Amino acid sequence: MPSYTLHYFNHRGRAEICRMLFAAAGVQYNDRRIESSEWGSMRSKMPCSMMPMLELDNKIQIPQSMAMARYLAREFGFHGKNNMDMARVDYISDSFYDILDDYMRMYHDKDGRMMFSRSKDMNSSSEKRMRYQETCRRIFPYLEKTLEMRNGGNQFFMGDQITMADMMCFCALENPLMEDQNILRSYPKLQALRNRVINHPKMSAYLQKRSRTEF
């Protein structure tokens, strides 16, 4: 097995899905958290001048958070078991990522850094907030129905085994639910799924000991 280094800011953000996959698999990795003050001097050294970035054996670099997550999910057994199931895990995960991405863009500064603060919530542009809200309105009903397609939505998205898709349901909605506890009020299956992820033995252990960050 290769050695892994995950490069990202000291946030959950777009890297948390990878941290959850490492935790679910019980695989050790170097969680390299970069302070915002360091980013200016490091940016040009990163693929596409962006993070997160996953590094294997200190030589292979994988950018793009969902490409990283899919790689780890396949490596660790948290993806689909055949091509159709993999497509299902992918489109569910990418749908949750759309919500996460639109939410985070409300709080980006011009250099791509998060400027999230409870006292500055209203500084997010109305256009970006409207886009985020519309994304939620489009995607939540679809994901609720998609979850119900397997065992009435009473287990995980792929049945009785947790996958990347379920972890994305949890991590993509952490901060949105802090802002608005009612966003899943009309989607009880999704809310119950998040609780199953929280109570999954590996996830529960990880969530209790992980670093506490604002976003």
Curated annotation (Swiss-Prot):
Alphabetized InterPro entries for the sequence: Glutathione-S-Trfase_C-like, Glutathione-S-Trfase_C_sf, Glutathione_S-Trfase, Glutathione_S-Trfase_N, GST_C, GST_superfamily, S-crystallin, Thioredoxin-like_sf
Domain of life, source organism: Eukaryota
GO molecular function, one term: glutathione transferase activity
Tissue-specific expression: Lens.
Keywords: Eye lens protein
Every GST C-terminal domain range: 82-215
PROSITE patterns: GST_CTER, GST_NTER
A Pfam family reported for this protein in Swiss-Prot or TrEMBL: GST_C_3
Residues covered by the GST N-terminal domain: 2-80
Any one Gene Ontology BP term: glutathione metabolic process
Chain's role: S-crystallins are structural components of squids and octopi eye lens. Contains relatively little if any GST activity.
Entry similarity comment: Belongs to the GST superfamily.
Protein name: S-crystallin 4
Native species: Enteroctopus dofleini (North Pacific giant octopus)
